[in-house]
């Protein structure tokens, strides 16, 4: 388990979160990649942040959970960056992503954020 991962996410919750990311991508707005995700957290526009667990080197995303905590933004870990990238609409993996407008996934994003808080 990477240093920055401080709680385990059940597989069914991860699947639900990735599905919500896909809906948000299609009906709302999503930021993809470490830099875009970091900026959305800092600007207060992120509603839910995704961080991949298989990022090498770990330092690329190590700051994101701490920053999200500081700004009060819920975040979830995803096992594979390929899964995260595909859910965000990329043909390649993504180390991080953020939902900035949930669109039709609004209720799902809130539900996932609540479940993640319970895990912590």
Curated annotation (Swiss-Prot):
Q: Which GO terms describe its molecular function?
A: ribonuclease P activity; rRNA binding; structural constituent of ribosome
- Give me any GO biological process, just one: translation
Check the record and name the InterPro entries matching this protein. eL8/uL1-like (IPR050257), Ribosomal_eL30-like_sf (IPR029064), Ribosomal_eL8-like_CS (IPR004037), Ribosomal_eL8/eL30/eS12/Gad45 (IPR004038), Ribosomal_eL8/Nhp2 (IPR018492), Ribosomal_eL8_arc (IPR022481)
Q: Is Hydrolase there in the keyword field?
A: no
GO CC, sorted alphabetically, is: cytoplasm; ribonucleoprotein complex; ribosome
Q: Which PROSITE patterns match?
A: RIBOSOMAL_L7AE
Query: Which Pfam family, any one, appears in the UniProt record?
Result: Ribosomal_L7Ae
Q: What are the protein's UniProt keywords?
A: Cytoplasm, Ribonucleoprotein, Ribosomal protein, RNA-binding, rRNA-binding, tRNA processing
Record localization: Cytoplasm
Its assembly, as annotated, is: Part of the 50S ribosomal subunit. Interacts with protein L15e. Probably part of the RNase P complex.
Task: Extract the PANTHER family matched here.
Answer: RIBOSOMAL PROTEIN L7AE FAMILY MEMBER
Q: What is the documented function of this protein?
A: Multifunctional RNA-binding protein that recognizes the K-turn motif in ribosomal RNA, the RNA component of RNase P, box H/ACA, box C/D and box C'/D' sRNAs.
The UniProt entry's sequence similarity note says: Belongs to the eukaryotic ribosomal protein eL8 family.
Q: Fetch the NCBIfam families from UniProt.
A: eL8_ribo
Protein's UniProt name: Large ribosomal subunit protein eL8
Q: Which organism is it from?
A: Haloarcula marismortui (strain ATCC 43049 / DSM 3752 / JCM 8966 / VKM B-1809) (Halobacterium marismortui)
